Amino acid sequence: MSAIDTLIRGRQRDLGGFSVHRVLPSGPRQMVGPFIFFDAMGPATFAPNTGVDVRPHPHIGLATVTWLFEGELLHRDSLGFTQVIRPGEVNWMTAGSGIAHSERTPVENRERPSRLHGIQSWVALPRHAE
């Protein structure tokens, strides 16, 4: 008997200029415990004057967890927080009753080729934290 219940094969998803390997949600599993989305980003290489441009968008009732192996992402949100996420650092954004945020390659990194490699997961919050 195996301890593995379901093997989920990821699929490529375009996020506007770069692709992620998305494992969740999937046909056989929409969630695993509190995990709603699970994306592997890259490794991706961007030419000069290009990069990640995830425009402002809303979230509600969840937390996003971003961890980079390589590259940098500029996180900005509607609560006024700005953070450059670097390799080995974690960005945990709790949406609760609502937040909007963007993720972009920092301006200073766009002058030269850049790389991005990391993971991002969306975690459902308990009802009392929404």
Predicted regions, residues:
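Short, Gly/Pro- and small/polar-rich lid/capping loops
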Residues: M1-G10
